[in-house]
Amino acid sequence: MRIKDTLNLGKTKFKMRGNLPVREAEWEKEWEDNHLYEQRLKLNEGHPRFDLHDGPPFANGNIHMGHALNKISKDIIVRYKNMNGYYAPYVPGWDTHGLPVEQQLAKKGIDRKTMDRAKYRELCRQYAEEQVQKQMTDFKRLGVMADWDNPYITLQHEFEGQEIRVFGEMYKKGYIYKGKKPVYWSWSSESTLAEAEVEYKDVEANSIFVAFPVVDSKGIIDPKDTYFVIWTTTPWTIPANEAICVNPKFDYSVVQVGDKKYVVATGLLDKVAEEIGWDDYKVVQTVKGADMEYMKAKHPLYDKESLVTEGFHVTLDDGTGLVHTAPGFGADDFNVGQKYDLPVFSPVDAHGRYTDEVPELEGMFYQDVDKLMVEKLKDAGALLKLKVFTHSYPHDWRTKKPVIFRATTQWFASIAPFRDQILEQIDNAKFIPSWGKTRLYNMIKDRGDWVISRQRAWGVPLPIFYAEDGTPIVTPETIEHIAEIFDKEGSNAWYTHTAKELLPEGFTSEHSPNGEFTKEKDILDVWFDSGSSWSGVMEKRDGLHYPADLYLEGSDQYRGWFNSSLITSVAVTGKAPYKEVLSQGFVLDDKGHKMSKSLGNVISPNDVIKRMGAEIIRLWVAQADTTSDVAVSMGILQQSAESYRKIRNTFRYMLANTSDFDPKENGVAYDDLRSVDQYMEIKLNDLVAECLAAYDKFDFTTVFKKIFNFISNDLSAFYLDFAKDVLYIEGKNSLERRSMQTVIYDAAVKLTKILTPILPHTMEEIWGFLKEPEDYVQLANMPKVENYTNHDELLENWGKFMNLRDDVLKALEDARNKKLIGKSFEAAVTIYPDKETKAMLDDLDADFRQILIVSKLTIVDGEAPENAEKLNNASIVVEHAEGEVCPRCRMIRTDIGEDPKLPELCERCAKIVEEDFPEAAQEGLEE
């Protein structure tokens, strides 16, 4: 018999390489074929619920790394909750209406303006449904477990019907109204935009200081050769000027410059003088802003007057303290105009071109008017200074073109009547990170009314009729009738039926004596679509629950979905749609740049999956602090792949060395485990407790860090490091070996369960090698936290031993550097411990020689010799061990040959072989 055959060498078919791109897809098919999502929910029926409501991504193109971060994060949470006993369904959603779909059709040469509206919308629907299927395939391939057969999609008939009911409730309560006011207007997409559809970019702009001649100063200042100085960054709005706004609390200086006088805010005088170039000026008078109200100036270009008004939005941050006010082109301007009954003059059309209301500018694009105004003011002698500067300006988030403020007639949702209720609901909700609460609170506190109408084709139509005299018709009966039609036919019914067919049978109105009605042409803002999903999905679907326990999206959704959902939910039910909000940062490259094709830094999840596997992306998510921006690059993903390899190889070692272990037959009770095995069991138990607590806080970064640290330090660098001397060398059924196998097997089971939400494919593969009752690890529950009575005592003593071990490893390294030894098993170590360390060693009563992986260990209770290395907890002498290397245990021993039956082996190995392989004692051994 060969010596090798007497060793208990580990064996496993669990491969070192995961072959993830191939194996993952096989697992996903198996999960789907065996209905694992449904099986898990069935196991948890009647248990406490956990409802994560999926914020719907827009259905357009393949998924990007931001999608992957979001969906994997949700999947980790839902998988954990299900394995921890919660009934945690997950219904994925898609946002499908809106401009991007129309843009894609335009690229194909389809013109919505020349096509029947219903047919055009059908093409939009087809495109959106194709995109949903494309993204669904991508999400499934990330290993996301969900109710893929029953997703919610904002174009579904029932969803659209319920959205109409949400609108109807808000209308009934008086929150919806029609009005004319300035809104974000995208000339590039010919529609209004919500705040959430606007992004800011730095652009160069003309800023001008303009002199408005004073014509009526109420007798307070001399109007002769006196000018109000305004500053604006939008010269193109000068034709629409109706007023000059001052802050009633500020002081204003009348400044003599040559033979002219100028009025500016006292607090900005020095800055303005420097900007314009007034070298020699003198303050001749100071007046209060409050006293300037109702003064008048002459428009420098047009035959009209400009009224001086008050406004607390006027600041001393920039400009002159006198604000050019055009009620048709700005929110603050509009509010001032309402107070003073000024005209809402907005002579720019949907394409950003001036109308015939300013004849000489008719047909000119507003940006061209910008340059023209500078020239005209210069020619009129009214331009005091032109300066080109860079500032942050709103752009359409889809077309990337600048937007303008433009007063148009729109439908609005007023939040003022229930703003306090919303703020109270924000206070009641929990936010991760905690600053999210303040951010959303301030947004709601400061936000104006929500413009909910859009001048587009692809969306849910505003369910409003108009009577013959133009009166809007919206009643509970008309709303429910339309909702029921949409439930059956979808919102395209609005375009395939006449107004009469869409109204309840026999409907009449005093405003339509002839019984004629027309339909509203505008559609609802897409944020109203997704913002009503709490009702169309969580409230109305069987098996789901409202309010949701968690909303999890990117931090841009504080002004998007978190915001719109909150408004509609509180408006209709009085409560927030979520109990908790978790926001994540954006995915950037490793240099902190946004991903873009022009920079060439785009990483596609599908490409990564083909090269490395979805598990590597999932591990990247688990390793990242997602509450702030998250970096990704091929280098970073390579680091995740290295972490994966470390985890996989550790599991391979554990599986190989427990392949002959059956927990029912060979398991050792905790009280019978060796001290070092109990210590590892306690460390494992503490890890379980820490990981469950971190999962409960949705902190899977901590889960991964704790597990990786345990695998790297507690297992690989310590327990499994000295395990070979037990697992390979000791008798197959010896207490020492079975004790250690008990712990290793337990660690494999518990680590597999805890890692399943993060690495489901790999953990499912590992589960197949464990002797556990559940067919799939996803059908198993998270490990329970045990209570060990000797927990504190063992942790303290073994903690002290680990400090001593550090000393020994240091001494061994020094001996290696001095060429005294090569490997640690060549060493004979003598320890002279301090009093506390000696007491610890006596208490633990363990095989420290084995644990330290040395051939000989002597502990001396006495004074250390001169040649001892003085370290933190002991003095240590390292020498080369005397004797020969035992070919079986590889230790240097002086007792080789003492057993005449097996003269090749040391006494320990000879005894083990005689017990386990009696035939070897008779026949002898060979190398």
Swiss-Prot record:
Matching PANTHER family: ISOLEUCINE--TRNA LIGASE, MITOCHONDRIAL, SOLEUCYL-TRNA SYNTHETASE
Residue window of motif 'HIGH' region: 57-67
Lineage: Bacteria, Bacillati, Bacillota, Bacilli, Lactobacillales
A Pfam family this chain is assigned to: tRNA-synt_1
GO cellular component: cytosol
Top-level taxon in the UniProt lineage: Bacteria
EC number, UniProt record: 6.1.1.5
Gene coding for it: ileS
Cited function: Catalyzes the attachment of isoleucine to tRNA(Ile). As IleRS can inadvertently accommodate and process structurally similar amino acids such as valine, to avoid such errors it has two additional distinct tRNA(Ile)-dependent editing activities. One activity is designated as 'pretransfer' editing and involves the hydrolysis of activated Val-AMP. The other activity is designated 'posttransfer' editing and involves deacylation of mischarged Val-tRNA(Ile).
Subunit structure, interactors included: Monomer.
Catalytic activity: tRNA(Ile) + L-isoleucine + ATP = L-isoleucyl-tRNA(Ile) + AMP + diphosphate
Name this polypeptide is given: Isoleucine--tRNA ligase
Organism: Lactobacillus acidophilus (strain ATCC 700396 / NCK56 / N2 / NCFM)
Family stated for the protein in its record: Belongs to the class-I aminoacyl-tRNA synthetase family. IleS type 1 subfamily.
Motif ('KMSKS' region): 594-598
Amino acids binding Zn(2+): C886, C889, C906, C909
Binding site for L-isoleucyl-5'-AMP: E553
